[in-house]
């Protein structure tokens, strides 16, 4: 039987009251500082490998110097190294990484391995939200097959999936911080596949609704812990572009669902939508089992400690992350952390609220597309599905904006000071106004039935703001709460999913009362009122973070 203290090793460091919310683990900072100094030594070294072996990002002395200066000037890095050395000198029983270049540290993995993991996580993060909207075009067939005329039940088949997105992360994210990312990915992926089969064979409308909720719970795993996985693999100053790729999933997935569903529903029927989802998800799940390995450093170190205890017989050995909490207290602290962060952190609550509003607008717009383009512009069901691509084009433009500027802004501003997560919010400050602009264009061009390309242009503007809002918020949360990244992103996913599930239910009544023009104008005015939120946290976020750091 394992030592109870060793069972509590994976996450005990995350429960210390003295740990600041924006500190990163000492080993990671030591690793970053070491590589930053190497990057600034000679330009010839810049063309070989960065800290992850990615030569494209350090192929100029200017880029390398910025990164090196930023890392050398990090006071957190210096203090963590001193603390690490002090602990090692005092207690020889502490188990740590074998130096800054330890190959078992995910930060030191080969570039191909890191990028493969990020690609697989991003893929499953695309597939899961795809399942949220893929049934939207099949709702009329579902109601007809089950002999129901209740339109609200039809909408519930779609929205209850998002309620599963809200419930799942509250359990999945904390468990990933106890037992690692991989067990949660694998278990949830298998459950998702089984529940997808159930949805494809559902005998009644009520069973379909219940299975869709459970399907959403299982499918929430990549939304809950994907950001944490990227935090495990990529240091802060290089994290932006990878978070941008990851964030495409929650936005492009719901957009491509109706595109695929529009044609497949007419050709094969609504049940084939679930079989298609199963084939896509099952393929990625099989690859995940073969390729992916644990990325969470705390769990890796706990496993190393247990192996050394068994090998040496020295049960006094303990992980550098272990502060001796009992398993019961560890469970209690970890499981309630996402809820506490959502309630007690103004940063997570307000930014998640703003992002949830924009994300809810996405699903609300979905309810208007069949009416606007089917009745106003007389598009067929299949062609109506294609209009969702306007949102996708906006997402791609938003990704380019974020990918080009985010990491460059962080390095440029941090060259003479500390790496501050607030620098991630600057692209969001620039583009937040594209959300109300897009809503105004879409609403009033549809109201007066001008050429069909104009409302689609409006959705492009909205898509830009949606993507930048999502990726900036997620990247900022991961950078600011690195040690609790999974719990922080889970708290964000909960609010985003609740609003995404409930807001569309109010759409038909609102548009019936106000019309498509003034209805979208109301949404635009609300979005306009929220535009200062990113600026507030860009300016005052650091102060707010430090004032609330010990709450959870």
Swiss-Prot record:
PROSITE patterns: MFS (PS50850). Residues 38-47, 71-80 have a biased composition (Polar residues). It is a multi-pass membrane protein. It holds the Pfam family MFS_1. InterPro entries: MFS (IPR011701), MFS_dom (IPR020846), MFS_trans_sf (IPR036259). Glycans are attached at residues 73, 314. The chain crosses the membrane at residues 118-138, 153-173, 182-202, 214-234, 244-264, 272-292, 346-366, 385-405, 425-445, 452-472, 498-518, 521-541. CDD domains: MFS_Tpo1_MDR_like (cd17323). The keyword Membrane applies. Residues 1-102 are annotated as: Disordered. One of its GO terms (molecular function) is transmembrane transporter activity. Its main location: membrane. Belongs to the major facilitator superfamily. This is MFS-type transporter atr4.
């Amino acid at each position: 039987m394992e030592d109870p203290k060793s069972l509590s090793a994976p996450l005990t460091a995350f429960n210390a009251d003295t740990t600041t919310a924006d500190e990163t683990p000492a080993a990671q900072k030591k690793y970053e500082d070491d590589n930053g100094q190497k990057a600034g030594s000679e330009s010839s070294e810049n063309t070989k490998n960065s800290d992850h072996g990615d030569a494209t990002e350090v192929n100029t002395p200017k880029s390398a110097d910025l990164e090196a200066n930023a890392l050398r000037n990090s006071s957190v890095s210096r203090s963590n190294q001193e603390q690490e050395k002090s602990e090692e000198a005092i207690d020889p029983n502490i188990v740590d990484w074998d130096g800054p270049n330890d190959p078992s540290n995910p930060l030191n993995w080969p570039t191909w391995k890191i990028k493969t993991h990020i690609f697989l996580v991003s893929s499953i993060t695309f597939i899961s939200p795809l399942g949220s909207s893929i049934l939207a075009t099949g709702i009329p067939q579902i109601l007809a097959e089950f002999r129901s005329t209740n339109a609200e039940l039809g909408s519930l088949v779609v929205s209850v999936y998002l309620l599963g997105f809200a419930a799942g992360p509250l359990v999945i994210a904390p468990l990933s911080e106890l037992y690692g990312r991989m067990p949660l990915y694998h278990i949830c992926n298998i459950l998702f596949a089984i529940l997808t089969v159930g949805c494809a064979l559902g005998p009644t409308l009520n069973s379909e609704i219940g299975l869709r909720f459970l399907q959403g719970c299982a499918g929430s795993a990549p939304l809950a812990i994907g950001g944490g996985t990227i935090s495990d693999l990529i240091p802060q100053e290089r994290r932006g572009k990878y978070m941008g790729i990851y964030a495409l999933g929650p936005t492009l997935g719901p957009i491509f669902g109706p595109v695929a569903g529009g044609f497949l529903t007419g050709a094969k029927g609504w049940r084939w939508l679930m079989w298609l989802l199963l084939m896509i998800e099952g393929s990625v799940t099989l690859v995940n089992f073969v390729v992916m390995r644990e990325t969470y450093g705390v769990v890796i170190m706990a496993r190393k400690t247990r192996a050394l205890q068994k090998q040496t017989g020295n049960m006094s050995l303990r992980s550098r992350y272990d502060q001796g909490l009992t398993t019961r207290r560890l469970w209690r602290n970890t499981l309630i952390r996402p809820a506490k962060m959502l309630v007690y952190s103004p940063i997570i609550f307000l930014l998640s609220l703003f992002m949830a509003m924009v994300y809810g607008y996405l699903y609300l717009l979905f309810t208007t597309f069949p009416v606007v383009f089917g009745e106003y512009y007389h598009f067929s069901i299949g062609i109506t599905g294609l209009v969702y691509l306007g949102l996708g084009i906006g997402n791609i433009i938003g990704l380019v904006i974020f990918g080009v500027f985010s990491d460059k802004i962080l390095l440029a501003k941090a060259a003479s000071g500390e790496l501050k997560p607030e620098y991630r919010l600057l692209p969001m400050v620039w583009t937040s106004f594209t959300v109300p602009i897009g809503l105004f264009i879409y609403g009033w061009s549809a109201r007066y039935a001008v050429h069909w390309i104009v409302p689609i242009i409006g959705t492009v503007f909205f898509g830009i703001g949606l993507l930048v809002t999502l990726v900036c918020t997620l990247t900022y949360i991961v950078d600011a709460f690195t040690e609790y990244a999974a719990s922080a992103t889970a708290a964000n996913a909960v609010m985003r999913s609740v609003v995404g599930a409930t807001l569309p239910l109010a759409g038909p009544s609102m548009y019936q009362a106000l019309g498509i023009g003034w209805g979208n104008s109301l949404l635009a005015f609300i979005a306009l009122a929220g535009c200062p939120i990113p600026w507030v946290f860009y300016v005052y976020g650091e102060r707010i973070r430090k004032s609330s750091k010990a709450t959870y």
